[in-house]
A protein has these predicted regions:
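PRPP-associated nucleotide enzymes
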Residues: 1-126, 131-172
């Protein structure tokens, strides 16, 4: 395991984002740990979180993409923190985008926040926790509805590696 991943786990514990005990996930499964990224509450924590994500994104995808998409709600601050960190650390000005849970019917209207997603854009999705892959399955149609775009991958802080439909891991299923 890379050093930054070990440091990230310690960071989650220090921020009380990662807790150990007896919990039940949204999918109804019992688990000995729980992750709540809503416990990142300060500017310093979000800056450091963005740096971890920036390193993971660069290691996995490089910087050859256009938009970092954070699904509502918890993906919104993740996408903002990571794009700031990418700009500071790598000098790349990546755009961020996220969605609203409900379409706005006044003002600027629409479902997207941040940058629009344009034809030809390569998009990386950023998430906090993946259990069954449900939020990603909901996110892909939103991204693809924006035009001829290419979702190239996903970066997630915690993949519970639970099984999806059949015997496939949830992220492989997607």
């Amino acid at each position: 395991m890379e050093a930054y991943k070990k440091e990230f786990i310690e960071f989650m514990v220090d921020c009380q984002v990662l807790k150990f005990g007896d919990f039940v996930t949204k999918s109804g499964r019992k688990t000995p740990f729980f992750v709540n990224t809503g416990f990142y509450r300060t500017g310093a924590q979000l800056r450091r979180l963005g740096q971890y994500y920036a390193e993971a994104i660069n290691n996995k995808f490089g910087l050859g993409f256009d938009v970092l998409f954070g699904p509502a709600y918890k993906g919104i601050p993740l996408s903002v923190a990571a794009t700031i960190a990418i700009s500071e650390k790598y000098g790349q000005d990546i755009r961020y985008c996220s969605n609203r849970k409900e379409v706005k019917d006044h003002g600027d209207k629409g479902i997207l926040l941040g940058s629009p997603i344009n034809d030809g854009d390569k998009v990386v999705i950023i998430e906090d926790v993946t259990t069954a892959g449900t939020s990603i399955e909901e996110t892909l149609p939103i991204i693809k509805a924006q035009g001829d775009v290419n979702p190239i991958g996903l970066v997630v802080s915690v993949d519970r590696m639970e099984r999806g439909k059949g015997t496939k891991l949830s992220l492989i299923h997607i």
